[in-house]
UniProtKB/Swiss-Prot annotation:
Ribonucleoprotein as UniProt keyword: yes
Protein name: Large ribosomal subunit protein uL10
Record Gene3D superfamilies: 3.30.70.1730
GO MF, one annotated term: large ribosomal subunit rRNA binding
Keywords annotated in UniProt: Ribonucleoprotein, Ribosomal protein, RNA-binding, rRNA-binding
Amino acid sequence: MSEAAIAKKAEIVKQTTDMLNAAQSAIVVDYRGLTVAEVTDLRKQLRDAGIQMSVIKNKILDRAVEGTDYEDLRSTFVGPTAVAFSDEDPIAPAKILKKFADDHDALEIKGGFIEKSVKTLDEINEYANMPGREELLSMLASALQDPMRKIARAVKAIADKEDEAA
């Protein structure tokens, strides 16, 4: 192999390592059996959520995780491999990919990491079933508003009772 080709591959490995290190989460999938239209639809869904999906050679991924906390992912680098990276919402890739995999049997989630910690397939599925950040904030706001509503109703009831008595 020429020196230029080796340098190019080393740069690709470095870029992949940088993407892994910068990501809040990365989910490894096998996309074998998906049609071009299905892959395009999946990429669009991921892109709309701010997630980048890249098809990366297994050997490059293997070298990119070498010496990192993600070495346990090496066993997932078999067959056609794509990786969905998220820099913002660590749960979003798991949610979108699980939903897509439920609708398309050909997509298989193989593993990944969430918030810098390698997760098993079962753990990724648990995360995927959790409410998203926006849903959790909405639930929190509702929980905080409920006691205030009760107090407001009680104060209003007392005021109405005093108005009737007067």
